[in-house]
Amino acid sequence: MALKNALTGSVMQFTLATVLGDLIAFIHGHTILGLISPKDLDLFKDKLAAIRPQPVPDVSFCEDLDAMETALRLREALGRIFGAVPQFKKYVYVFPGQHPYAAIYAEKRDPQEYVAQVDYAYLKSLSPMSARTLSELSSLIPKVDCTVLSGEQLGKIQNFLHTNFLSSHPRLISYSDLAILSHPKLSKEEGSKYTRSAATAMSKNPVLLLVPCHLVISKPLYDEFRLQLKSNPNAVLKDAGKFRLGSDIKSYLMYRFGINVKRPA
């Protein structure tokens, strides 16, 4: 019901349109990974067609990965939290505002079934979330309640927050420390098989971003890619939006470091 009310509200409509449009783009890029079937994707897009935002802006002018990704991320959302375990096929968004809420979208389900509000006091009382984790979440999403979903999905988020990856990093990795796509071979040392994440800061407003099908790569690999991008941006960025969903970055890195012998087109 909260989602339905927000969709009809003039203030929140633009924000939701932007967020949901970005979600469509995100899901579309991951159908091959089995997160959602093409049939369900079409049904989902039909439901949201009336509130689609304007197209993603041209990013061919961007000099590096930071600028390119920043141009493509949501400006309205202070935080986005995705389900940590891919097979659950659920996505959680945290919106800005006085009364933020999280919405989960699951395959073959009505999105409105997955809307709930949980206040920060309740979140703080949960176990096994550590004080450190809560502190980091609070600092990343200032002046906004850390809103998550109750029940099953909340447990999955808690599971993720206690993976070896976050335990091994006292602070969440900043955007300049990583690229958000890679291959398991490159991040094998990071621990848990469910550790598929990236954390970033966008512009002057830090944003927590946990992406279920992405793996963090090492800083040397990321630096190498940035050098390639800066030295010959026209060759790397062949067209606007080429790396919008990251698949071409992944292909390039896999080829460059000998994981895939086939040169990307």
Regions found by a protein language model. Give the residues of each.
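Basic nucleic-acid-binding alpha-helical/helix-turn surface characteristic of O6-alkylguanine DNA
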Residues: 2-188, 249, 256-265
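Short, loop-centered acidic/histidine patches that primarily coordinate divalent metals
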Residues: 28, 203, 214
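IMPase-like, lithium-sensitive Mg2+-dependent phosphomonoesterase catalytic core
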Residues: 173, 201-202, 233, 244
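Extracytoplasmic/periplasmic beta-strand context in beta-sandwich domains
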Residues: 176, 200, 214, 251-252
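Short regulatory "switch" loops immediately downstream of catalytic or recognition motifs
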Residues: 180-186, 216-226
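Regulatory, non-catalytic segments
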Residues: 191-208
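Short Lys/Arg-enriched helix C-cap and helix-to-coil transition segments
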Residues: 209-217
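…primarily DNA-binding HTH/wHTH and HhH modules…
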Residues: 219-265
